[in-house]
């Protein structure tokens, strides 16, 4: 496993995350966080894939912020649906996870604005940076 997530940038002009991969690929990157690579500008359709490696069994809470749409798949399950054209909107999602690797996919598109961020929410409901060491790819 390598550090970070794979990020594929598509030249996307749509309004639904499910349609991103039909658009032409403009670039491929590795990112250390759920975010937009600096080089990515203009029409953005982004698909981030890899694994989330959690250190211990537990119930994990995540905050996903995006402008415009985003979706979060974890272990093949649609965990967060923040799809559609909108100003910045944050959703909070929870999932019980066993220690170890879990497949993750984040889809994101931007019509105008450009915000994508995923954070960990601790037991005190405080947001923390998702540790970059938790993100891996093959």
Describe the residue ranges of each PLM region.
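Extracellular/secretory pathway-exposed regions associated with glycan biology
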Residues: 1-61, 65-138
């Amino acid at each position: 496993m390598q550090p970070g997530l794979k990020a594929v940038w598509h030249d996307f002009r749509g309004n639904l995350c499910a349609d991103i991969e039909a658009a032409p690929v403009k670039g491929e990157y590795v990112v250390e966080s759920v975010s937009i690579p600096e080089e990515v500008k203009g029409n953005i359709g982004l698909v981030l894939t890899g694994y989330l490696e959690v250190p211990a069994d537990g119930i994990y809470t995540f905050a996903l912020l995006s402008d415009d749409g985003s979706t979060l798949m974890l272990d093949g399950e649609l965990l967060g649906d923040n799809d559609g054209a909108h100003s910045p909107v944050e959703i909070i999602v929870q999932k019980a996870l066993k220690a170890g690797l879990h497949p993750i996919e984040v889809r994101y598109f931007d019509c105008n604005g450009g915000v994508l961020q995923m954070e960990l929410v601790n037991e005190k409901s405080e947001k923390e940076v998702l540790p970059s060491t938790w993100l891996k790819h093959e």
